[in-house]
Amino acid sequence: MTINLKNFLIDKPKLSKMGDFQELKQIEGLEISAVSADLYGTGRDDLCLFYFKEGANYGAVYTNNSICSESIIWNRKIRKSLIKALMVNTKNANTFTGSQGQEALENISKHLSKVLTLRESQKEGGTNQAIKPNEILFASTGVIGEKYPTQQIKGNIQFLVDKLKNKHNKFIWFKAASSILTTDTRPKLAYEECKIGNKAIKLSGIAKGSGMISPNLATMLAFVFTNAEIPSVYLKSLLKKAVANSFNAITIDSDTSTNDMVAIFATNKVKTGKIYNVLDSKLKDFERALQKLLLNLAKQIVGDGEGAKKFINIKIIDAKSQHMAKNIGFSIANSPLFKTAMAGEDPNWGRIIMGIGKSGEKIVPEKIEIKIGTFKVAEKGKISEEYNEEKLKEYMTSDLITIEVNLKLGQASFDCYTCDFTKDYVDINADYRS
């Protein structure tokens, strides 16, 4: 498998070199390939396959948008706890494609299952087991409402399967992560290690997302792979919990995609002994590692927000409940006025006050204390006596902005992450289909 240089022959000024990313390690039991089906007409990689020869346990969370991709509809119908493959395409969302999009997945899944089955029957050390269409998951990202390119994808299935690699380093992961991008300027990759009992466990993850980011359940596309042996039912519980404070804590433009999917796959190659329930103490370190990995990927998505120049961490503390803290945090983060002020490096804290007030939460204005960075800007229902406009303006020129809102109503807190709105965001989305 070679790096496709055409992935980089596009106007993406923030596109990073492979050396800028973590060293992702091999996950035993997983094979990966990424090829070009020429969906963009440029020759860039746009089709990716993750194959589990002996199957993988999995858990997934999907978009809460009432209109969703045919890929999501397909996946929700899968009742298998052990799956064999995940295929991902970019350029086309397979959303609002009607029966054509649905029939496309039926057609492609049958063809892919036959090609994989034939490969296993002919390969030395193959399983000689038939792969079934309902053991295959799909993910799609791209333009909504365009006819799904069935024949283009189907015609490249053999090529995709022939390119599968069971040994993967940063090079292979980087190629896979690059193949699922749309308006992203860089791939997103993350790696963690942990222990279950006394067994060493690896987790490797990739993600894509740059716009249409404001999740209600998951966000955009993110896939995590581990060599641990964990039942599917526990994987899903752990994933939902980890998503709550990672992918569900970010927003770029307040839009929830029709295609959002976050999934975790466990190849069961490291036997960890019986796990009695999701609260089993053996899983604590794995839970920590999963949370850290997902938050890493989520922050990378925010950092690559369409046209973004600033990464903003909004911390709501001392709220009555986490629900209150989260509502207020997102009320601020999703405000176009707030986000454009950040882009203009304007310490207009009135837009933070506005965001707090429009959240609908019952707050006590006189108790609120607001800091931008380490600088106190408001307290006791008015501007702080410590307010220093010049120091604030200097702070606002940094790439990383932290805002803390202390409600002084309780002990709950929530961190959310967003970015600024620049003129580039408008340009990118105005030209998205061109």
Give the location of each predicted region.
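A structural signal for small-residue-enriched, beta-sheet-centric alpha/beta enzyme cores
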Residues: 2-116, 131-434
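Intrinsic disorder/low-complexity segments
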Residues: 117-130
